[in-house]
Amino acid sequence: MVSCKLFARGPARFRAAPALNSITPAMTDKPDSHLYEERISSEAAYDGRFLKIRNDVVRLPNGNTSTREYVVHPGAVVVIPLLDDGRVLLERQYRYPIGRVMTEFPAGKLDPGEDPLACGKRELLEETGYTATQWARAGALHLAIAYSTEIIHIYFARGLRAGPRQLDQDEFLDVFSADPADLYAACAKGEVTDAKTLTCTLWLQNVLSGAWQLDWQEHAA
């Protein structure tokens, strides 16, 4: 595992997020039928090896028509790996579209027909070399709701056992461990900007504080 002094140490005080069931009822109970859009037609604008783009014509709630151009994504999984000493596993990886090395939790896209948990186990092993004896599904993240179908399933993993990584020949990333408080501080200072990692950090903070509960399941490593 690569040693990384990414985070400056120091106190990080955060107020716990409200429990999910405390959201104002008006936000969830109001009928939304007056907001829906009806698809009239759909055509493929681009069909790539990984991503596809569609261009749809929709009927708006007021009867007018408009176009919706969006990316069709196979979905992905992100894993929050908890080490026995209380630290978490993270990665540093270059992301070409933004030209930066990013701090991220281990993640990867779903293969066709793949179960999200199986994908999480596979990605954790391939990218970090670790396996886990306990897993818990936390939730999901819709990454870019205005222009993409992508959904990222969020899992926690613990009971970690180290082993050799299984990176693809053309895959390059560093793995390191960090104290959660250092991760919180890095997020607060804007040093972590990856959306899935910010969402996972919110989950991590609330799970470790006891505000949010997980249903842990035993799995063979």
Predicted regions and their residues:
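A glycine-rich, hydrophobic loop/mini-helix early in the fold
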Residues: 76-104
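Short, Lys/Arg-enriched N-terminal segments with co-localized hydrophobic residues
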Residues: 16-26
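Acidic, metal-coordinating catalytic segment for phosphate/diphosphate chemistry
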Residues: 42-78, 84
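Extreme N-terminal tail/first-helix region
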Residues: 26-47
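Unchanged
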Residues: 66, 75-78, 109-195, 215-221
